[in-house]
């Protein structure tokens, strides 16, 4: 009797629909909207800079744990949610994620201006639960409607939609502050968009594939860590997520300016450009070699952000870091899968669990900033993450 908790439905698998050369564009729209909604949880790291202004210095250590409340749930709930999805399906799991997202966004808003920090923890915790369900469901839901040979390109499109939601964060917050004096209307706006996305998905018929007779279990996933390539790539994804969240946490603190959140806009705008450029380059250059180039550049940019203080230089360095980090997740994921192609489900399970590494970024970066009194020193944590990824890129073998 299989006792391992199953992960099969959190992994893209080849379904009869995927073998068809055409994409059902009627279904594609609401699924890509899911990627857009997926990006809402990533606003927590940069928005903590605004929340921190509402609390005294004695509470700043607690505020820095807010991003942890989102990413912790990837570690705790990814497996149970995958098991639930085995029973109720991918679309239903995504809709449950939308519901938790709406409630999580509205809790601190309904609590009101100047609410206790606990309301933010409760709201962002629920937001993390919802986002875990969305992450578990949306990628494989996309896999049911696109042909297998085009999965990579459509997953890239999905990431562009996710990054676009982050790109719009700073302009929306800046406009809200100018019009209302507060950023907090962002929460019901995001909640409303999530409701619309849920209605759109619910109204769309999605033919999900039949269940597989054999599901990947947790023991199967962790057993793969004995493969050096899979281990390097799993830790690479963990460092990528941790570094990415760290940049989001620090970007609004690197410039002492009310418009400092615009550094987040530059970061994600350049990431979108980097994703598009990477999609073109990776057809012509080895993925590992491209990873080496980008991580070398990213490490140099981290060093620059430790030293530079001019606003223009900070904007440029943060933006270029976003460009360099654009294709990292896809590269580690692809290299690990190619190392053990017969264990693709187990590899993907490890990657989902690795996302939980983002939970450490806020507390660690916050502690460094409080210890040093300078947000730029928080880039030491990001540099450590990038340094590992650069080292791993040289340990990985280039497949011709």
Where are these regions (language model features)?
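Helix-loop-helix hairpin linking two adjacent transmembrane segments in secondary transporters
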Residues: 149, 157-209
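Hydrophobic core of transmembrane alpha-helices in multi-pass small-molecule transporters
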Residues: 117-133, 313-327
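Intracellular juxtamembrane helix-capping segments at the cytosolic ends
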Residues: 133-147, 326-341
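Central cavity-lining transmembrane alpha-helices of secondary-active solute carriers
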Residues: 65-83, 265-278
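Extracytoplasmic
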Residues: 26-57, 139, 247-252
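Cytoplasmic helix-loop-helix junction between adjacent transmembrane helices
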Residues: 123-160
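Extracytoplasmic gate region of multi-pass secondary transporters
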Residues: 44-45, 227-272
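C-terminal ends and interior cores of transmembrane alpha-helices
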Residues: 99-114, 297-309
């Amino acid at each position: 009797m299989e006792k391992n908790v199953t992960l099969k439905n959190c992994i893209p698998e080849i379904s009869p629909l995927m073998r068809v050369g055409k994409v059902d564009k009627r279904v594609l729209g609401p699924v890509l909207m899911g990627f857009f909604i997926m990006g809402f949880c990533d606003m927590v790291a940069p928005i903590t800079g605004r929340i921190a202004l509402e609390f005294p210095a004695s509470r700043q250590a607690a505020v820095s744990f807010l991003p942890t409340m989102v990413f912790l749930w990837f570690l705790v709930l990814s497996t149970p949610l995958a098991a639930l999805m085995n029973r109720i399906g991918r679309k239903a799991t995504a809709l449950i994620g939308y519901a938790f997202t709406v409630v999580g966004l509205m809790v601190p808003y309904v609590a009101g201006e100047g609410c206790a920090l606990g309301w933010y923890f409760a709201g962002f915790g629920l937001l993390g639960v919802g986002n875990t369900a969305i992450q578990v469901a949306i990628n494989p839901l996309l896999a049911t409607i696109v042909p297998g040979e085009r999965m990579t390109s459509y997953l890239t499109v999905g990431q562009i939609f996710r990054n676009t939601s982050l790109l719009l964060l700073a302009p929306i917050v800046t406009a809200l502050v100018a019009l209302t004096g507060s950023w907090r209307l962002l929460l019901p706006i995001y909640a409303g968009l999530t409701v619309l996305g849920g209605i759109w998905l619910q109204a769309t018929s999605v033919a999900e594939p039949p269940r597989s007779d054999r599901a990947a279990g947790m023991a199967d996933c962790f057993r793969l860590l004995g493969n050096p390539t899979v281990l390097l790539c799993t830790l690479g994804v963990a460092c990528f997520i941790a570094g990415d969240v760290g940049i989001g946490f620090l970007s609004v603190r690197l410039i002492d300016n009310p418009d400092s959140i615009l550094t987040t806009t530059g970061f994600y705008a350049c990431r979108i450009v980097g994703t598009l450029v990477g999609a073109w380059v990776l057809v012509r250059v080895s993925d590992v070699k491209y990873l080496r180039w980008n991580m070398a550049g990213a490490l140099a940019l981290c060093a620059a952000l430790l030293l530079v203080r001019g606003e223009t230089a900070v904007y440029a360095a943060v933006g270029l870091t976003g460009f360099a980090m654009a294709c990292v997740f896809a590269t580690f994921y692809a290299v690990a899968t190619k190392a053990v192609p017969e264990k693709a489900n187990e590899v993907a399970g490890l990657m989902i669990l690795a996302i939980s590494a983002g939970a450490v970024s806020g507390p660690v970066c916050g502690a460094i900033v409080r210890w040093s009194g300078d947000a730029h020193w928080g880039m030491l944590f990001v540099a450590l993450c990038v340094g590992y990824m650069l080292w791993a890129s040289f340990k990985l073998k280039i497949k011709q």
